[in-house]
Structures are given as C-alpha cells and as structure tokens.
Amino acid sequence: MTILPKKKPPPPDADPANEPPPPGPLPPAPRRGGGVGVGGGGTGVGGGERDRDSGVVGARPRASPPPQGPLPGPPGALHRWALAVPPGAVAGPRPQQASPPPCGGPGGPGGGPGDALGATTAGVGAAGVVVGVGGPVGVGGCCSGPGHSKRRRQAPGVGAVGGASPEREEVGAGYNSEDEYEAAAARIEAMDPATVEQQEHWFEKALRDKKGFIIKQMKEDGACLFRAVADQVYGDQDMHEVVRKHCMDYLMKNADYFSNYVTEDFTTYINRKRKNNCHGNHIEMQAMAEMYNRPVEVYQYSTEPINTFHGIHQNEDEPIRVSYHRNIHYNSVVNPNKATIGVGLGLPSFKPGFAEQSLMKNAIKTSEESWIEQQMLEDKKRATDWEATNEAIEEQVARESYLQWLRDQEKQARQVRGPSQPRKASATCSSATAAASSGLEEWTSRSPRQRSSASSPEHPELHAELGIKPPSPGTVLALAKPPSPCAPGTSSQFSAGADRATSPLVSLYPALECRALIQQMSPSAFGLNDWDDDEILASVLAVSQQEYLDSMKKNKVHRDPPPDKS
C-alpha cells in the first residue's frame, strides 16, 4: 500500500479548481485525444523517484523515426522513445517523437543523464513538477528543431495526475514548441558571435572535405525549411510557397495520423503553418518525406545526419539534405556531383541529370563534327597545295628537259654537219630554240613559217629567178613544232633543195611523246608571259629568211660557171 504525504494547505489566493485530488485511488484519466499522462517520474523526465508499478509504451503505426512496436524492458522503465506512465493513467496511441540533443551539449542545457527527450526539462525535475497533464505530449512547433519533443509549460509546484481542468489545460498548451524557440533565442543571444562564426566555418569545411557537400544559404525569413526543401526538389528556393501548400494539404489529408503529434487544435496548427513566415519542424519534415518519397536527412554541426525521416516506400533516390544552424535556421545541403532536382515529383521515366548529360553529349558531338570538318578542309588545302607544287615541279622538269634536249640536238647537228655550214645550222637551231621557248599555246595554228608566207612574202622575184620552190606549209608546220629541226641527219638532207622540202622529218625525232607534253603546257611554264609573241616570231622569221637567201645565193654561184670573156 502506498502512503501518500499529507495534503498541504492551499495558499489564500489559490484556485480550488487547480488543487490536486484528495488521497486515495487515482481515477482513470479521460481519453482526450489519446494523450499520455506523465507523472512525476525519475531522473529522465520529472526528477523524482520513478513509479515502478506499471508502464505502457505507445507505438508508431507507420514509417517514422520512432521504432515499430512496443519497446522491450521491465515495466516502468524509461526508454528513448517512451515515457513511464503512472498508475491509473491511460496510454493512447500517440508516442513521443525522437529528440537529438542540441548543439549545446549531449543532453541539452540542463538535461540529466536520462533526459533524452529534449532540452527544456532543466530545473523541472528538481521542482518535482508533473509534466503532461491528461493530454497529449506535444511534438514540434512553429520554430522547433529537427526532432525535439516538448512538454507543456506550467507553473512550478502545480500539477494534476489525471483530471485537470480544461481551462488550465488550454492555458498551459500554447504553441506546439514555443518554449524551445524562446530558449533557442536566449541561447543565441548568450553565445559569442566569434564562436558561432568559427563553428559555422568548421561545419561547412567538414561537410565539404569529408562528404563533398556544399551548404547553400537560404533566406532567413521563417520559411527557411521550406526554402531548403524547394531548393532540393525544384532547384529554386523561391518555390517554398508551393512546397508549404503541398505539405499542409498532405497534413490535412492525413490528419487522423499527424494530429496525434500536435498538442493544440490541429486545424489551428495547420492554419498557422500556412503562413509564409511561420517556421517548420520535424512534423513537416516527416510529411514531406512521405509526400516526395525521399528521406530527409538533417545535419547539425556533424558530418553524419543527426536525424533521418523516411518515407513510406523504400527506394534508391537521393535524400533531401538540410542543415540546422543555431537551433533556429535551416539551409540546403547540395551534392554537386549528383543531380537531385526533380526527384519525387512523380514524373514518369524521369532521370536526374539526364537532360544535362544529353545536352553535353550533343555539344560534344557537334564539336567533334565541326572539328572533323575543319580538319577535312585543312587536309584539302594541304592536298591542293601539294598538287599545285607537284604540277609546278613537273612543268619545271619538263621545261628543263626540253631545253636540254634542244641543246643536245644542236650539238649533234654541229658534229654531223661539220664546219661547212656552221652559221646556217646555228641559226636554224637558234631559231628553233626561240620558237620552242616562246610558249605558244597552239602549235598547229600559229606557225611562224605560215605567218611569214601569208603576211610578208619577201623577194618573190628572187624565188622565180632561182627556180626554187619555197618550203611548203606542211613542211614548215612540221619544222615549227617541237622537236627542233636541228636533229641529226646527213648533209645531203640539208642540200637537197626540193627533196628536203618533201622528205618526212618526223623520223628524225625519236622522242615524239615530248611534243605532246609540250603542246599541253601553258606559256607560263617557260616564263615567257611577259614577252610579246609577235616580236619574237618576227625576229626569228627575219633571221631565218636572211639565212635562207644567203644559202640560195651561194648555191647558185657554185652551180653556174663564170662566163667566157673570150
């Protein structure tokens, strides 16, 4: 049998409605929304002695940070995810949310060794205050941190075990975690700015060096959590209003589940959270993890996440990463080496980063095609230059070869003819050389012999007196073409007169293929473009005619005997 202490007399100004019940058996607590009544427990919650008579543990009905099913342990034992329940209290289906310790210390400011549920119980256990009177234990709030659970604030020394008055409950309820926000603001004001800046710098450097992540700063306007999620999902933090609206709509559609973790009226809570300047907490994180079916990882001055919110279905998608700073602000943690934008939006056959990869492939392909075309053009230019060079070399070789052939023929003619007619042979060879080097484009139509016979016939009476037939056009045409007429032959061929005009001269030239090559060559191959063809032909024609007349006169003198003077 439990012996209760005597009832203390109430102060004169005390409210009778707030007095504890008289000694005796505890009445059953009303089932107001399935709340968990918590008596003055041990060191983990209230600071007094734990009641070891009974304990009931609630369970999370779906994927969430709390573990599935009842927790093992002796009756009345305190766990990280459960609270000891005093005798007579009713345990509802609303479990307590997990609470990682804030950055101030492992158990939070004022937290004892067993205080694993938050940082707001400092001084409460020492005063022996009963926490959570006949109602649900609040989880999160307007400006709460990642997974910090809360208790209601009540005046020290005042509490009820099972049936507290509704008026006092409404006064003690307040916002869902307003006390933590006030405590966080007080801690921020007490911290040294230099220390805070150094801690932030270390946090960013550690994430970048170890994980390769980059902390992307979000605007500090109360919507930092939704801005961070919008940056992860849409790639634009200005989409935070859309993310907030979808999140609140999802909470309303699943109000039967999420209302178990809110101390105040759920509709009032949702209406307040729809404001763009209202902070988000881990209830919204859990909703967004289920809504986008992506885990939500929270980093707080550590390279490993302090809390992870899972969706309903497991997949291999990249998680939504956010960082928690100074217990009041969220930023987006971006992995620059892996695209996550668009994941979770329900787009069919969507592959993160596929558009960028496709654009990169197209750009590389276009660049390669342009480079190949440029190289082909350069090769064509080089081939054209090579061909032009080869043609120039071939023309030069052909010209030098032809001139050398002419010189060889002239030497052979001098050797065969002897000293009898050196002047005629040299003149004929020189005229042939000049005619060959003049660079005529049409050998068959522009013969110097034809032009001389047609335009300027000189001394026709001399030809009549001598009785010598001038060279026929066909013979002159053959002589005008390359090969030179200074080909080797007998002396009778040069003194035969009419027989020489009709004899076939083609047999005198063994290299007939050279003539075809020279006929196809342009005058530029010989470098004679700057010379006047008419002047060259006129000079050659004059020399040839003069030599021909001189030879005729000498032949006539030798044939006719001198007249008899007797």
Curated annotation (Swiss-Prot):
Phosphoserine (modified residue): where?
A: S64, S165, S177, S323, S332, S370, S447, S503
Q: Where is the composition biased (Gly residues)?
A: 32-47, 105-115
Q: Which molecular function terms from Gene Ontology are attached?
A: cysteine-type deubiquitinase activity; deubiquitinase activity; K48-linked deubiquitinase activity; K63-linked deubiquitinase activity
Superkingdom, taxonomy of origin: Eukaryota
Q: In this chain, where does the modification Phosphotyrosine occur? A: Y175
Q: Where is the composition biased (Pro residues)?
A: 11-30, 63-75
Q: Which Gene3D superfamilies match?
A: 3.90.70.80
Top-level EC class? hydrolase
- UniProt KW keywords: Hydrolase, Nucleus, Phosphoprotein, Protease, Thiol protease, Ubl conjugation pathway
Q: Region labeled Cys-loop — which residues? A: 218-224
Q: Name one GO biological process term.
A: regulation of T-helper 17 type immune response
Signal peptide positions are none
Residues the record marks as active site: D221, C224, H329
Question: What do we know about how this protein assembles, alone or with others?
Answer: Interacts with TRAF3.
Q: What is this protein called?
A: OTU domain-containing protein 5
Where does this protein come from, organism-wise?
A: Rattus norvegicus (Rat)
